[in-house]
Amino acid sequence: MEIWYTEKLELEKGRAVSYRVTKTIESLQSPFQKIDIFETQSFGRMFTLDGVTMVTNKDEHSYHEMIAHIPMMSHPNPESVLVIGGGDGGTVREVLKHPSVKEVVLCEIDKAVVDISYKYFPECADAMKDPKVIHHYDDGAKFARDNKGRFDVILVDSSDPVGPAEVLFKEPFFRDMASALKPTGIIATQAESFWYHGDVITSLFEFIPKIFPEYGYYYTTIPTYPSGIIGFTFLSNAIDPYAVTPDPKRVPKGLKYYSPEIHKAAFVLPEFAKAYIKRKG
């Protein structure tokens, strides 16, 4: 008998995506969310939170490389990095590929995510064992609020704006992050798909221009996320994302998705999606 895992998309009512499961590896309920690990026919090992796909062996690199390397390559010398969420370790792994980095603070509210990632996704999670990585298991907004002016780059590797992640899409959280940045710092946050979540993106860019003088939206392609793409905000007090020309000499070796050409192209949006982003001028 065939077994299928079906993800009913919370933010896209009336839609679902199914994957053939060859093995259910582990299921557990943490204090914050339900965690499942499957072996799938098409995407290898799959990690879900509350029935929503987070990571698969086949395509995780496109998400992790793009949330990390776009801001890291845009900053002239990123030394101190905060990752909020991202307990699977993939974003931390990519950040550590930049030799300028001296510390990475991982602020993950759910320690169970980290523990199960060590067990089943070592290709992502083992990076979190690096001595440069500081683990902090707490609310990301509070941590940002308590660390003013500390970070060159802040990356918010969050799930969708429901449940414990909902606060990460609200104006107070973005103000807390702004206070934690150094003057030339950059923030990138998971910001949904322009195909299905125009309302979410529009709501973000209603308040973002009030906080950051420089901002933009970019995206990556990833087949296991709704619509096959996922977007990110790019926020800064000093660095215009549309004016950045990445230095090819700084690109980490062995990447599977990111390149200087992809960097520039990621900010080019279809006409309908441009309407979601309030740009000055």
UniProtKB/Swiss-Prot annotation:
The active site is at D157 (proton acceptor). Gene3D superfamilies: Spermidine synthase, tetramerisation domain, Vaccinia Virus protein VP39. GO terms for molecular function: spermidine synthase activity. PROSITE patterns: PABS_1 (PS01330), PABS_2 (PS51006). It is an enzyme of class 2 (transferase). Residues 2-237 form the PABS domain. It is found in: Cytoplasm. Keywords: Cytoplasm, Polyamine biosynthesis, Spermidine biosynthesis, Transferase. It holds the Pfam family Spermine_synt_N. InterPro entries: PABS, PABS_CS, SAM-dependent_MTases_sf, Spermi_synthase, Spermidine_synt_N, Spermidine_synt_N_sf. It catalyses: S-adenosyl 3-(methylsulfanyl)propylamine + putrescine = S-methyl-5'-thioadenosine + spermidine + H(+). Pathway: Amine and polyamine biosynthesis; spermidine biosynthesis; spermidine from putrescine: step 1/1. GO terms for cellular component: cytosol. Signal peptide: none annotated. Its EC number is 2.5.1.16. Homodimer or homotetramer. Catalyzes the irreversible transfer of a propylamine group from the amino donor S-adenosylmethioninamine (decarboxy-AdoMet) to putrescine (1,4-diaminobutane) to yield spermidine. This is Polyamine aminopropyltransferase.
